[in-house]
């Protein structure tokens, strides 16, 4: 089967890391990029050097129409209006919408006017169907043209919640994600009228914040709808975050049982390569560049009793999430081709 041809709209953090993951996996073929705010020489520089993930392992050059990466030409467009991007001329059928701006079905659908066939939003969406690989990707149908890969935190929490719910019954749960700072935060205290705390210096503070990631699990696992909610603590680290899920189970269970069950789920079936498992004494930087959605930390969790437990699972919120964007495109293109 032909490798799906991909276009990326928005060459920010996720756009560039999706690009790197596309090359690392070989499962999709990026043929075009659109970003009105980045000219090609600067795009080449930003792709080549990365403060978190290091230098790009390959060759990057520019030519009159875009970039040449590992000897392959990639068209570069600079359109502000998604409807004006000539994706079809570059052969791009699957578009990664990673600007963070066009996150509704209506807005993201504009890409279809330029010759694209499907749009994958690399963020939660108010109305587009959300898919989490290993959890509900089999619900995808070929008539869906705009879909969301949910958020990095939902991709970490959902596989964990699925294993607990499938095996022990999840009555209810509260999640806290201890989350690295992101591009929306500030380097020094600055105006942030909609989120006063969010305007404070990212590298100096632990900042409580809201997140819809836990509630979104109810959209990808309908039986958990209304059973999970959560919050975020933004902390002064550049990358890698960790989910803390405190939950009640229907069945009586020991923490050892939970460890065995999660370990088994990580080694075979739908969650292999998506859910990880470790008993090592790791810290956050040990997981930079880890491609799992969720890495269960067996030593970090605790149980109060047979029904009340705290589970801890790590995720590289840039790399792991971006790999799932690539996986989702590879998966839906396979379904589309059948």
UniProtKB/Swiss-Prot annotation:
- EC number(s) on record? 1.2.1.12
What residues bind D-glyceraldehyde 3-phosphate, as annotated? 151-153, 182, 211-212, 234
InterPro entries named in the record:
GlycerAld/Erythrose_P_DH (IPR020831), GlycerAld_3-P_DH_AS (IPR020830), GlycerAld_3-P_DH_cat (IPR020829), GlycerAld_3-P_DH_NAD(P)-bd (IPR020828), Glyceraldehyde-3-P_DH_1 (IPR006424), NAD(P)-bd_dom_sf (IPR036291)
Name its GO BP terms in alphabetical order.
Answer: glucose metabolic process; glycolytic process
Protein residues bound to NAD(+): 13-14, 35, 80, 317
Pathway info? Carbohydrate degradation; glycolysis; pyruvate from D-glyceraldehyde 3-phosphate: step 1/5
Record-linked Gene3D superfamilies: Dihydrodipicolinate Reductase, domain 2, NAD(P)-binding Rossmann-like Domain
Catalytic residues (positions): 152 (nucleophile)
Reactions catalysed:
D-glyceraldehyde 3-phosphate + phosphate + NAD(+) = (2R)-3-phospho-glyceroyl phosphate + NADH + H(+)
Q: Per the record's keyword annotation, is Cytoplasm included, yes or no?
A: yes
Q: Which GO terms describe its molecular function?
A: glyceraldehyde-3-phosphate dehydrogenase (NAD+) (phosphorylating) activity; NAD binding; NADP binding
| Top-level division of the source organism's lineage | Eukaryota
Q: Where in the cell is it found?
A: Cytoplasm
Keyword list (alphabetical) reads: Cytoplasm, Glycolysis, NAD, Oxidoreductase
- Please state what class of enzyme this protein is: oxidoreductase
Q: Where is this site: Activates thiol group during catalysis?
A: 179
Parts of the chain that traverse the membrane: none
Q: Which GO terms describe its cellular component?
A: cytosol
A Pfam family (short name) is Gp_dh_N
Q: What is its main location?
A: cytoplasm
This protein's assembly is summarised as: Homotetramer.
State the similarity comment.
Belongs to the glyceraldehyde-3-phosphate dehydrogenase family.
According to UniProt, the name of this protein is Glyceraldehyde-3-phosphate dehydrogenase
- Organism equals Aspergillus oryzae (strain ATCC 42149 / RIB 40) (Yellow koji mold)
Point out the gene that encodes the protein.
gpdA
């Amino acid at each position: 089967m032909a490798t799906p041809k991909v276009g990326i709209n928005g060459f920010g953090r996720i756009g560039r890391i999706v690009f790197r993951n596309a090359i690392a996996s070989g499962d999709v073929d990026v043929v075009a990029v659109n970003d009105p705010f980045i000219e090609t020489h600067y795009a080449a520089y930003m792709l080549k050097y990365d403060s978190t993930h290091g230098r790009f392992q390959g060759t990057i050059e520019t030519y009159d129409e875009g970039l040449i990466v590992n000897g392959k030409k990639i068209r570069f467009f600079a359109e502000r209006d998604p409807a004006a991007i000539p994706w079809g001329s570059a052969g791009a059928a699957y578009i990664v919408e990673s600007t963070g701006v066009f996150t509704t079905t209506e807005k993201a659908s504009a890409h279809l006017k330029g010759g694209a066939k499907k749009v994958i939003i690399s963020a939660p969406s108010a109305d587009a169907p959300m898919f989490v690989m290993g959890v509900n990707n089999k619900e995808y149908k070929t008539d869906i043209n705009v879909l969301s890969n949910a958020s990095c935190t939902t991709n970490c929490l959902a596989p964990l919640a699925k294993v607990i719910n499938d095996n022990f019954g999840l009555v209810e749960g509260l999640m806290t994600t201890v989350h690295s700072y992101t591009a929306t935060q500030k380097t020094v205290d600055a105006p942030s009228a909609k989120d006063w705390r969010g305007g404070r210096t990212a590298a100096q503070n632990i900042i409580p914040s809201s997140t819809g990631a836990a509630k979104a699990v109810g959209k990808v696992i309908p039986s958990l709808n209304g059973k999970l909610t959560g919050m975020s603590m933004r902390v002064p680290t550049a990358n890698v975050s960790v989910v803390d899920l405190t939950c009640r189970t229907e069945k009586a269970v020991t923490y050892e049982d939970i460890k065995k069950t999660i370990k088994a789920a990580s080694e075979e079936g739908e969650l292999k390569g998506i859910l990880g498992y470790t008993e090592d004494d790791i810290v956050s930087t040990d997981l930079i560049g880890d491609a799992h959605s969720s890495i269960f930390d067996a030593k970090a969790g605790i149980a109060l009793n047979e029904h009340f437990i705290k589970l801890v699972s790590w995720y590289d919120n840039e790399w792991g999430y971006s790999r799932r964007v690539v996986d989702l495109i590879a998966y839906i293109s396979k379904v589309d081709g059948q």
